Amino acid sequence: MFFSQVLRSSARAAPIKRYTGGRIGESWVITEGRRLIPEIFQWSAVLSVCLGWPGAVYFFSKARKA
């Protein structure tokens, strides 16, 4: 049963592979880019808040004194 499913799947994938240039689906780089870009933005936002809040406090307290 399992082997017949594997054979059917590989028989279907072989003609598709000829037309797609050697791979089924999108490139690994595109997949990882879609996954990592939001995480990089979130990481940079958290890092900016953690490191930048003292500067923001200093800037806004200085602006109100003047």
Swiss-Prot record:
Residues 65-66 are mitochondrial intermembrane. Residues 1-8 form a transit peptide. Keywords: Membrane, Mitochondrion, Mitochondrion inner membrane, Transit peptide, Transmembrane, Transmembrane helix. GO terms for cellular component: mitochondrial inner membrane; mitochondrion; respiratory chain complex; respiratory chain complex IV. Residues 9-27 are mitochondrial matrix. Its main location: mitochondrion. The chain crosses the membrane at residues 28-64. It is found in: Mitochondrion inner membrane. It is a single-pass membrane protein. Component of the cytochrome c oxidase (complex IV, CIV), a multisubunit enzyme composed of 12 subunits. The complex is composed of a catalytic core of 3 subunits COX1, COX2 and COX3, encoded in the mitochondrial DNA, and 9 supernumerary subunits COX4, COX5A (or COX5B), COX6, COX7, COX8, COX9, COX12, COX13 and COX26, which are encoded in the nuclear genome. Component of the cytochrome c oxidase, the last enzyme in the mitochondrial electron transport chain which drives oxidative phosphorylation. The respiratory chain contains 3 multisubunit complexes succinate dehydrogenase (complex II, CII), ubiquinol-cytochrome c oxidoreductase (cytochrome b-c1 complex, complex III, CIII) and cytochrome c oxidase (complex IV, CIV), that cooperate to transfer electrons derived from NADH and succinate to molecular oxygen, creating an electrochemical gradient over the inner membrane that drives transmembrane transport and the ATP synthase. Belongs to the fungal cytochrome c oxidase subunit 26 family. This is Cytochrome c oxidase subunit 26, mitochondrial. The gene is COX26.
